[in-house]
Amino acid sequence: MHALRSSVLALWLCLHVSVRAWMTYRSANGLDEYEPEDRIIFLGTKWCGNGNVAEGPEDLGPLKETDACCREHDMCPDLIAAGQSKHGLTNTASYTRLNCGCDEKFYNCLKNSAETGSGAVRFTYFTVLGTKCYRNEHPLICVKKGWFSCSKYELDKSQPKRYQWFDVSSNFAFPRMLT
């Protein structure tokens, strides 16, 4: 079973890299608009991917727990769309970024799911994509760099809180979790 999971993950990662390359090509050639058929949705879900293919809020795929986590994440009320600004921050990414509270809830939901698919979704969103989230917190100082992001932060409590970007990683190290 472990070998099968590893093979599926390897296949998915290859597909993901190919899709990202295709998206980069499309963007570079003025083909930024997504068509419904351009959506990439995890197998067994209707909400886990870029957009959704659900017929309504109650429509979930066979991986119901995983899909419910993705649906709730998609419905986060505090977000900054690509190219938009809010809370003094501008989202320069080509996708929507969310308040860290929504991402943290998403991480915990996926982590607590017994479904195998939840691990692949969690790994992809929190490790492969290398996205960021935002929250109102004291300024952070990165005291230890990891492979792709900061692995340890310290809060500068002498400064007032402000909205700022945080790396979303598999460790999900947010200020309230720091020592």
From Swiss-Prot:
**Mainly localized where?**
secreted
The answer on whether this UniProt entry bears the keyword Calcium reads yes
Q: Which cofactors are required for activity?
A: Ca(2+)
Positions with a binding annotation for Ca(2+): W47, G49, G51, D74
- Report the subcellular localization: Secreted
Would you indicate the residue range of the signal peptide? 1-21
Statement: the UniProt record of this protein carries the keyword Repeat? no
The molecular function GO annotations come to: metal ion binding; phospholipase A2 activity; toxin activity
A GO cellular component annotated for this chain's UniProt record is: extracellular region
Ranges in a coiled coil: none
Residues that make up the propeptide are 22-39
Q: Which domain of life is it from?
A: Eukaryota
Name the UniProt record assigns to this protein: Phospholipase A2
Species in which this protein is naturally found: Xylocopa aruana (Great carpenter bee)
Lineage runs:
Eukaryota, Metazoa, Ecdysozoa, Arthropoda, Hexapoda
